[in-house]
Amino acid sequence: MDSNSTADCPSLPWRAFSNTTMWGVAGLCRGFLSALCHAECHGKEEFTELLDSRKDLLQRTKGLITVSNHISVMDDPLLWGILPMRFWNKRWSFGSYDICFQTRPLSLFFTMGKVLPCHRSAHSQFGGLGQPAITEAIRLLSKGPFPVDHHRASPELQRWSRQNVCVDPFSDLPVAYTTDGQDAHLAPSAYTCNSNSWVHIFPEGKIHQSPRKTMRYFKWGIARLILEPQECPDVVPMWIEGFDDVMHESREFPRFLPRPGKRVSVTFGSKVDSDSVFGEVRSRWQKLKAKVEKSNPDSRDLPVGVLSDELLTNKEAVELRKEVTMKVRNLVLEVRRSRGLPDEDPKEGLVDTWLEEGPQREGHMKDDSWVRDI
């Protein structure tokens, strides 16, 4: 079995099934927003032009990250129904492993929908900054293809079966990785067609429905996506409103149905000057990485998106991630401010502030917000 296997793209049936899933969901979302909601979009033309400029794979020189607040279980994919239905407008995102990948039908559906399986530390021992989903996202934001040289699935899991549905049944290429040693997922970064891709992330990591339209603190995974790709990705901050009315956490039966007739809005900020905003911190990251690699042979020659334990836990590295994460959060706050909302309390962005919630992880909170750990 060739451990350096890569390819231009997955098999034609796999691509067709994935495109059908993406287009089907996008069509439903677009229909719901246009026919059953009062939807408005700001900054759409500029963002659409950016996506159009990226349609030619050979012309892409860097990845694209979109980042937004998270206010309902329907944010993704519903918000993308606001965009024109063009075949290159397809994002990658993260999905909670303990929710999206618990059955074979769900696993296959979300895999076809370009969702990476992400373990949450509160629910799994396999969570954290070093998990395979983060590695895959970093590689998707870089120029590939990349062989599966991290968390490689065992040989028997490289082939499709009724119990192993997240690998390409029409290809013998061994490009599956595992998130926990028991599962297998096709590694999208092993394909040239996924070079310099678009990745969307909700850094809050939880649904947060606040009457004051504030955000929780951002988790540090977003920092790895900016610091570690080969080239600093383009970053577009976003702000969404009204989706919490479509699927509010206090809704009663039938909970699974989105509520029509609501007013929703999606605001795309301008593309960030990544070199100006993140160039200096990326330079500091590279210097730190070189210093650690020089003193610790185990940290040397690691593939893209894979870090040694020292680089994951080093105090200076942690502080860098905190700094980058706060920069990203401030970018989203700028878009929020453009919607006429008052500045939030700076303490809203600090982890310590949210520790005051105590052991309650979700539900109706003391500050009158609703939180769902999803």
Predicted feature descriptions by range:
Residues C118-F126, N164-A176, I207-K213, K315:
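Surface-exposed cleft-lining segments at the edges of enzyme active sites
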Residues A137-A187, D301-D309, P346-E357, R361:
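Intrinsically disordered, low-complexity cytosolic loops and termini enriched
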Residues M1-N19, W23, G27, D52, ...:
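Eukaryotic N-terminal targeting leaders
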Residues D2-F47, R104-G113:
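A transmembrane-helix-recognition feature enriched in membrane-embedded lipid enzymes
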Residues A7-D8, R15, P105, V175-L311:
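A cross-family acyltransferase "interaction/gating" segment
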Residues R263, F268-I374:
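Fungal C-terminal region signature
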Residues S11, D56-P132, E136, G144-V165:
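Catalytic core of membrane glycerolipid acyltransferases/transacylases, capturing the structured
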Residues C29-H70, S171:
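Helix-to-loop junction immediately C-terminal to a conserved catalytic motif
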